[in-house]
Amino acid sequence: MKKLMVIPLVAAGMAAMVGCSKTPVKEAAKNDAINLANLDTAVAPGTDFYQYACGGWMKNNPLKPEYARFGTFDQLRDNNQEQIRTLIEGLSETPGQEGSVGQKIGMLFAMGMDSVKLNEDGYAPIKDQLAEINKLGTKDELTKMVATLHKEGMAPFFALYVGADEKNSSMNIVQLYQAGLGMGDRDYYLLEDESSQKMREAYKNYITRLFTLIGSSPEQADAAVNAIMKIERGIAEVSFSREDLRDSQKNYNKMSIEGFKAKNDLLNWDVYFESMGMMDIKYLDAKQLSFYEGLSALMKNTTLDEQKYYLTFNLLSSAAPYLSDPFVAADFDFYGKTMSGRQEQQPRWKRALSTVNGALSEAVGQMYVAKYFPASSKEKMLKMVGDLQKALGDRISSLEWMSDATKAKAQEKLAAFIVKIGYPDTWRDYSGLEIKNDSYWANVRRSNIFEVNYMLADVDKPVDKTRWGMSPQTVNAYYNPTTNEICFPAAILQPPFFNPEADDAVNYGAIGVVIGHEMTHGFDDQGRNYDKEGNLSDWWTAEDAALFTQRADRLAQQYSDIIVVDSCLLYTSDAADE
């Protein structure tokens, strides 16, 4: 489960490696309630309740080498992928009419499965792009290339997103976010502990490997590593910490375009916004404002050649999962094994499926819903959500430490929740997306451009609150603070989380936990900063806010005492689970 915060569209992915035999979908038993085989009754619940409750399940479901962790969510995702596979494979074997959604889904999946073509092509699909980066000669040309990569779903230096203005949530606004780190988190670059140092060395090896695969000499690869690490460490040094990123007020900086340009000269901003097709915007939200000022100073201390190495690596790393096996292996060895702890690459069909799910998410979702999600499930879920809203409202009313004024506002927010169940009322139109038989990467690239253009079309327009932040076939759920909505896609509304034929007690104990978790996000340390309309607004009395923080700190301390992670980063989900 997650709280949906705006996340920049970044090219990522999974591509080709080995084939896999077809496996029949395992249909979940419709009338199973609590499976006693999941228990370990040899252990007394008072001695080790976790082992008692989950021991049997863990024994019967050992960790698979393609996973770094495996639980009921992962098990449901596996079953979900098998279901979607049966829907898609027929389309790849018997494509529909040219230009139809079925043809696009089938062709993209088939290209992801075509290991012969992928390995014959090598890195030919990106050669023209590499040449374009290599010939950059001026700041304006560099700026245009940054915009091009952003429009193709990558995020060199920073990321651009269009979403709700957090203090005027009915309108969309251009938002700029810190980004540009291949390892994701700034701490990997800045900490000097043994683990961070090993991660940096593995990252350098990954960079070297990619540049070697495109024919760079050892000297060129070394120069690339030095340039990329110099730039990315500089980006890390001016990036907000994870704790600071959780502070909604600190990350809201709406200003005029002219005001933003006056504060930094990172790029030629007129050229950038023109290249992005946004010549007429007047305002933006520069999320981490000091980041862009720091990045401007960094750019002055790096050469154009160093910046070109950095952009080249952004392209290589983004495209690697969609190229030949050596590129896929390099990507998996670093991001899959080193960073994530997985021992084996997922089979080719799962990776191709993931690409199709990303490129034509709602088209696949429409097929999935028609096959696996009856209308009766939606009706039952709506009743459960209503019951749990009432239960949460009763709990809010009974809080002894909260004032009546804050309680009234909390009840208003709870009553105003937008509830989304199963699938959107209106499906997206993919007629403008071209899927061709040129190359797998070319199709991923076109898909990314299609998605970014879809997002850019919302600039300075009203927020469409009927849109979904997840596809129906996603095994997850979310709360979005700027729309004050809770969403439960069809794929999570399957056994063991939801079973329309099971006893109510089972459903309230399973999906009910998920519903309660997401609703509580509206009142956690981040969600509580947004009002019933989704605006970033302080609706708590000062005394109540202090009492909330006092209790939150105690919860954080409790988790700090038992787990070896920063409790501040887990508080949102910890609080929702309590």
Protein language model regions, located:
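Bacterial N-terminal signal peptides
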Residues: 8-15
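C-terminal motif of bacterial Sec signal peptides marking the signal peptidase cleavage site
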Residues: 18-19
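Active-site-surrounding "flap" and adjacent substrate/cofactor-binding loops of secreted or lumenal enzymes
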Residues: 45, 52, 56-109
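Noncatalytic, helix-rich "gating/capping" subdomain that lines the substrate-entry/channel surface
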Residues: 91-383
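A short, hydrophobic C-terminal helix/tail in secreted or cell-surface proteins
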Residues: 574-578
